[in-house]
Amino acid sequence: MRLVSTVLDGPDVRALAEFYRDLLGWSYRPGDEPPPPGEPDPRGEDWLVLRGPQGRQLAFQQVPGLTPSTWPDQSVPQQLHLDFAVATVEELQAEHDHALRLGATVRLDRTDDPDEPLWVFADPAGHPFCIFVAPEQA
């Protein structure tokens, strides 16, 4: 058995997929690309898949009315989070700026940690994700 995809629920599947496509530079699964402006988007109303290196997939499932996580406050706990590694502190800062431009919000700043500098963000649907320095994993 093997893990095929990590799936994120969200109230706007297309917007969430576009956020991660821009953040990671991944591509849509054939047929999941956005339609031309003004055209209907039936694929973006339910389920979309992004594909990355080595066959990795990140999928998005429409869940109307999803309540975003409030982590680190536990009133609406996270169910999962994504970890992304970069090789240097300079890359960490560049990815921080990139994530904010795309609509992420900062949840935690631990960039002063000498062993593992990191940022914790929330994506536009409220899912927490981390970007941290780990040269051996980047």
Regions found by a protein language model. Name each.
Residues 1-5, 77-81:
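Short, solvent-exposed beta-strand edge segments and adjacent coil->beta transition regions
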Residues 15-16, 89-94:
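Short, conserved charged micro-motifs
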Residues 10-11, 89, 116:
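Short alpha-helix boundary/capping motifs
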